[in-house]
Amino acid sequence: MERSIVLAADVEADRARVFEVLSTTGGQRAFWTTDCDVSADKARFGFPQAPMDLLADVTTEPGKLVRMHVTSGFPFWTGSTWEWELREPARAETGTGVLFRHYGFAEGYAEIDLGHTAQTWAQIMERLAAYVASGSPQPFFPASS
């Protein structure tokens, strides 16, 4: 069985703003991890307790999609892809619908680990929604002290 994660949220911001946040270093630092660098075609994500960084190839469709394909990093993540697809909101009158997918984990990724990963991504999605609505950064992985 292929292991994948799918999450959805309607956020209180227009597509251009959500796309900017998802596709830039400043945006990613505001809701996910302060230790990152994102360019038009590459990204690096670091985490306080992780022994290695995640490196990813980035592809985008402005206003529609931000996709990151892992080229090296955590066990079972190399070769996986996460993406944010932007669309009309599904359950709100205004804003942007964000459909998040993470798929392509390596064979052997334990179901319990996938569950923990899904829970973490859900919390990161909440941070994204809060940031695009308020403009107040609250990264899930802040800088280590």
Which residues are covered by each model-predicted region?
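Hydrophobic ligand-binding cavity/cleft-lining segments
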Residues: M1-D37
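Short, surface-exposed coil-to-beta transition loops
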Residues: S4-V6, P51-L55, W77-E83
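Short strand-connecting beta-turns/loops that link adjacent beta-strands
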Residues: D14, A50, E61-G63, P89-T94
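Short, flexible loop/turn segments with low-complexity composition
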Residues: G135-S145
